[in-house]
Amino acid sequence: GFSLGRAHETNKESGAVLPVLMLGILILATCSTLLKASEAGPGSLHAPIIMSLIGGLIFGALAQKSRMCFAGGIRDAILMKNFDLLTIIAGLFVVMLIFNLATGRFVLGFNTPGIIAHSNHLWNILGMYAVGFAAVLAGGCPLRQLILAGQGSSDSAVTVLGMFFAAALCHNFGLASSGTAMNAETGELVAGAVTPNGKVACIICIIACFIIAF
């Protein structure tokens, strides 16, 4: 089988690489025009930077103290009958559900303009299966990896950088799926779809996870 092995201490400089890199990207994004940003669509929607930083620090501190992890919560519930982590995730879901209902932003469905989703459920399931499989092998979900990277874990830092790199590959090589949207010219509803390249990439990722695991 596969095992990450025990964590061990290393030099402090390696743990500071990712935080320093993220700080550099923040400075470039706010003080220069070197980095490009979306001017329309979901990628252009974000809170003011100060609010984002404050909210991120608060949520990050809570996630770190509670050891929040989606993969870990399911693992503990199944293997150890411990529902502590799963209770935290369920609580987060309930809070966000109430917030969205109260603000009128709750939408039940997939084929809805403005919602980044599609109704090709087989590939929704396979895509999240690949993510969950990789999270188990890596020792934590993407959120947990981000928290550990902030704590100074160089392994998690490499994982986070890998997620950035993979996101860039998806959007530059036609791997990313499209969400349901309204055609601005005809007014017709255009259903989201999974790209052929994305399907191939998903299958390759699942096969790679099986090879690593066994």
Label the model's feature ranges.
Residues 1-214:
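Membrane-interfacial helix-loop segments of redox and metal-homeostasis proteins
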